[in-house]
Amino acid sequence: MNRCRLLVIGTMAWLLTGCQAMPGFMPPAPQPVEPPTTFKILTYNTLHGLEVSKLWVRQVETDKQHKARFTLRIMQLAEAQPDVILLQEVNPLPVMAEDYVQALKQQGLDYAEVHQVDACGLRLAPGLAILPGLNNGLAILAKAPLTIRKLDGLKLSGPLGGCGDYAGVQFGELRYALLAEVTAPTTGMTYLVATMHLHSGIERDAKVLHELMEAHSQGRLQHYDQLMAELKMDEHRRQIELHTLMDALRQHQMHQHYAGVIFGGDLNFEVESPEYQQLGRAGFTDTAQIAVGMPMWNTYDPMSNPLAGHEEEALPPAFIEALAQEMKMDQDEAVKRYRHAIGMARRIDFLFSMAFMSNACLTQELFGKPAMMGDPSSSDHYGLLNTYSYQRRDCEQR
């Protein structure tokens, strides 16, 4: 009986081995994964909802308002589904960065994130801070199957001190850049990606300069030179920040071969400004210049975005200080001209690149702009969404 059973088992094993060797029983060969035909990258200043003064920070919206803006933003992100998302004014970190990941996961999207705090006040440990609601900063999200690795939280400018996830010491305005590398496993290509929020100060340098120069020519503003020096200081600080950024990007490129470089954020300068020209001389291209139709979208528009209009109500402390020695009449004139200048729509958010998907068709559009006038906005800025396509008809249809 046992011998018969062994004979049967042996025969079945032999038959199964033979069947597996037959062509009809070969396991299917793994199918090659086709790389995606489009790649989307978004930069967006999300608005932290804080009022920042020289010595203090306070929340200027209710928790309900903050949550409503976040929910709207997640819906907009889920619809656009960018492959890489560059965010500024993400507060508080690291909690808010993880909130983005989890909220997008609930929409069926799998993202990973890296982040860097750029404003923290005095924070000695988790839960032990002078400004407990402040741990603002930058985040980069990458959609699966992309992988992301943080390279550097780079301090661009500011006094001694620094900010981290759970501890930090800040004695004045700090500005950081967040550098990361993003790899596409389907192609094996790795890209150098960065985001930053540059110094603001007295905004619209060139326009305000023209307005104040005109007032000075009419016999107003006896301390005009002091105002001009303050404007130039803001410009100079941003140039230093860009120099620090570009030096770091070059260093990373020396140690690793990247298929391209792209960075973006709220840069607080405008087209043809000295800072804009500085990037051009360094070999970086404003991607709007190479996009189909060369769109020049206004990313900050106080006339159509109520959140932006509200942000412009407060005058920059540096501007108030620079006017302190002027007569009341001249102060009022300078403020009027300043408000006129900053009330105009303008482009201060950018995506700059170097050798990034240069063979693709590129289109650029605004992100987060309400479809109808009066609909809510999720930020005081509109984002910029770049779509790179390797199907030429996507360009021909526009």
Residue ranges and their predicted role:
Residues 43-69, 161-170, 199-237:
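Acidic/histidine-rich helix-loop elements
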Residues 78-82, 101-109, 146, 250-254, ...:
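Sec-exported extracytoplasmic/periplasmic mature domains
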Residues 52-57, 98-99, 125-129, 153, ...:
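Short aromatic-enriched loop/helix-cap "lid" or pocket-rim segments at secondary-structure transitions
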Residues 26-33, 90-205:
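Structured beta-strand-rich core segments of catalytic domains in phosphoester-bond hydrolases
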